[in-house]
Curated annotation (Swiss-Prot):
GO terms for biological process: mitochondrial translation. Coiled coil: none annotated. Belongs to the universal ribosomal protein uL16 family. CDD domains: Ribosomal_L16_L10e (cd01433). Keywords: Chloroplast, Plastid, Ribonucleoprotein, Ribosomal protein. It is found in: Plastid, Chloroplast. The keyword Plastid applies. NCBIfam families: rplP_bact. The keyword Mitochondrion does not apply. One of its GO terms (molecular function) is structural constituent of ribosome. One of its GO terms (cellular component) is chloroplast. InterPro entries: Ribosomal_uL16, Ribosomal_uL16_bact-type, Ribosomal_uL16_CS, Ribosomal_uL16_dom, Ribosomal_uL16_sf. This is Large ribosomal subunit protein uL16c.
Length: 135
């Protein structure tokens, strides 16, 4: 699973996801990409599941770039815990994704293979996405 090696603070506020993505919304590395159409928190497990699905689908050919990184800790309390006594411990990590953000990129494969692999990865995501081609 992806997670930061070291952070300045252990816990973060939830924040809010307003507007569209102002960065990471152009294809930089590959030729094909998966772009988010809705705002969401995407967990490190979901990112990894999508990456594995794509890798398994393209086999040897092609290269895959993961363009998001989970850098926000999500805390949780145990189910039996009473109210109060502070914020819970970090449980998992999420990437904050806004509409327009590129999630994955792919290159070195044909359009059909890329579309199939990216659609499988898209099914692992908790949001609506679209397949885009650079150029």
């Amino acid at each position: 699973m992806l997670s930061p090696k070291k952070t300045r603070f252990r816990k973060q506020h939830r924040g809010r996801m307003k507007g569209i993505s102002s960065r990471g919304n152009y294809i930089c590395f590959g030729r094909y990409a998966l772009q988010a159409l809705e705002p969401a928190w995407i967990t490190s497990r979901q990112i990894e599941a999508g990456r594995r699905a794509m890798t398994r689908n393209v086999r040897r050919g092609g290269k895959i770039w993961v363009r998001i990184f989970p850098d926000k800790p999500v805390t949780a309390r145990s189910t039996e815990a009473r109210m109060g006594a502070g914020k819970g411990d970090p449980k998992y990590w999420v990437a904050v994704v806004k509409p327009g953000r590129i999630l994955y990129e792919m290159g070195g494969v044909t359009k059909n293979i890329a579309r199939r692999a990216i659609s499988i990865a898209a099914s692992k995501m908790p949001i609506r996405t679209q397949f885009i081609i650079s150029g």
